[in-house]
């Protein structure tokens, strides 16, 4: 008096016992091949991720070294020295080249203060703009720069609120 499960188990055991050695070897080799293929895909993905991270770090270090130049360009633009002429075109080319590499300038008056992207250098009294609660930016002393999501330099700002 055997149950159907016991009969099925005995049948599969007898099939495994009668299985040809080459079939077992082929199954083992297939499993090895699939495992190696998965390891290779993971390796390729890891290398691509590392390359992207290294590229972003390299661009970030170049931007860090160019920050004084970018600050001078911004000051010249604020003082009206870059309204036209060859220096204006050079400044525009530098900024557009950096934009192509994912460099973004940030920091604007009346935006909410965020300590992860702003560095508050001064606190002053001022009326809060409509729709802004809490601390907000009153003046941008030096803009901040990002490469992707990485903050290269926080925006240096004056805040109120």
Regions found by a protein language model. Name each.
Residues 1-68:
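Charge-rich, N-proximal long alpha-helical rod segments
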Residues 72-161:
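Structured alpha/beta interaction-core segments
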């Amino acid at each position: 008096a055997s149950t159907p499960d016991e009969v099925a188990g005995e049948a599969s055991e007898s099939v495994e016992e009668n299985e040809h050695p080459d079939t077992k070897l082929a199954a083992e080799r297939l499993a090895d091949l699939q495992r190696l293929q998965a390891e290779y895909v993971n390796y390729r993905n890891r290398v691509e991720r590392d390359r992207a991270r290294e590229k972003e770090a390299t661009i970030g270090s170049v931007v860090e070294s160019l920050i004084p130049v970018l600050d001078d360009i911004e000051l010249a633009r604020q003082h009206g020295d870059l309204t036209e002429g060859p220096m204006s075109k050079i400044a525009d080319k530098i900024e557009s080249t950096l934009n192509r590499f994912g460099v973004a300038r940030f920091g604007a008056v009346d935006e909410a203060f965020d300590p992860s992207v702003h560095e508050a250098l001064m606190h002053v009294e001022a009326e809060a703009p409509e729709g802004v609660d809490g601390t907000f930016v009153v003046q941008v002393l030096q803009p901040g720069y990002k490469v992707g999501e990485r903050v290269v330099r926080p925006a240096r700002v004056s805040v109120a609120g």
